[in-house]
């Protein structure tokens, strides 16, 4: 029976996770002012450095607003958030398969992959194909669910790197948590095997410069995600 590796989170990670949970649960409300960093450090029993680093990360993720000489405030993260905010919401929920997250995410990822795979069929060459074959080999050998999900993302990110422009890998990397969460949630339910044939089909289509088939292979993956979503909310 395979076991997952245990990783100890840092104090900053724990502080950020606690604050995110309090904001997302509504315990801390938009516009509410936080205690001073010194007070937060005392209440959470961590150092000022941990609190300061955590607040910086939460501000970058759109959850907090730092007003110089005035204080730190909880934001209306629907208006101030970004992909980091969405990633935090996904982690808080524990699954992509919820009514308010799944369908918009599918639409976004399908447009992203259509754009990426069409470019990859034009631009990618032998070096990229070899790298993708190695990733698929690692995917076949992977044991842990999280490893398989990470390798599935790496497959598309490596494809983006092969497109010859900074834009493709950067925008694909921005969607990393979305893509990884989709694969991780579905691999927990279906296992990794159903996703290998579409990935193999994608690589074959890239070699053939067949954008329609490459995009169609990703849509096969999306349909498997959609089946899980439908069964989740079938009642």
Describe these PLM feature segments.
Residues 1-111:
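Short linear motifs at protein or domain termini
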Residues 108-184, 195-199, 213-228, 232:
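Conserved amphipathic alpha-helical segments that form helical-bundle/coiled-coil interaction surfaces
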Residues 10, 190-194:
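Short helix-capping and inter-helix turn/linker motifs at the boundaries of alpha-helical repeat units
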Residues 35, 40, 46, 52, ...:
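Generic alpha-helix signal with a bias toward terminal, lower-confidence helices
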Residues 235:
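Membrane-interface aromatic/basic loop that binds lipid-linked glycans or pyrophosphate carriers
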């Amino acid at each position: 029976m395979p076991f997952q590796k245990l990783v100890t989170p840092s104090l900053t990670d724990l502080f950020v996770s606690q604050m995110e949970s309090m904001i997302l649960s509504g315990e801390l409300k938009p516009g509410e002012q936080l205690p001073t960093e010194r007070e937060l450090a005392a209440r959470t029993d961590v150092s000022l450095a941990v609190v300061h680093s955590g607040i910086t990360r939460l501000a970058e993720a759109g959850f907090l607003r730092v007003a110089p000489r005035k204080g730190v405030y909880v934001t209306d993260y629907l208006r101030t958030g970004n992909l980091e905010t969405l990633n935090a919401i996904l982690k808080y929920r524990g699954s992509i398969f919820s009514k308010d997250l799944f369908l918009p995410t599918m639409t976004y990822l399908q447009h992203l992959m259509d754009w990426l795979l069409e470019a990859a069929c034009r631009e990618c060459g032998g070096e990229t194909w070899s790298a993708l074959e190695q990733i698929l080999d690692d995917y076949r050998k992977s044991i842990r669910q999280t490893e398989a999900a990470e390798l599935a993302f790496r497959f598309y990110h490596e494809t983006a790197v092969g497109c010859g422009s900074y834009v493709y890998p950067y925008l694909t990397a921005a969607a990393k948590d979305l893509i990884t969460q989709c694969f991780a949630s579905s691999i927990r339910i279906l296992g990794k095997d159903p996703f290998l044939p579409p990935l193999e089909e994608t690589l074959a289509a890239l070699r053939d410069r067949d954008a329609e088939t490459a995009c169609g292979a990703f849509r096969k993956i999306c349909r498997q995600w959609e089946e899980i979503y439908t069964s989740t909310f079938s009642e």
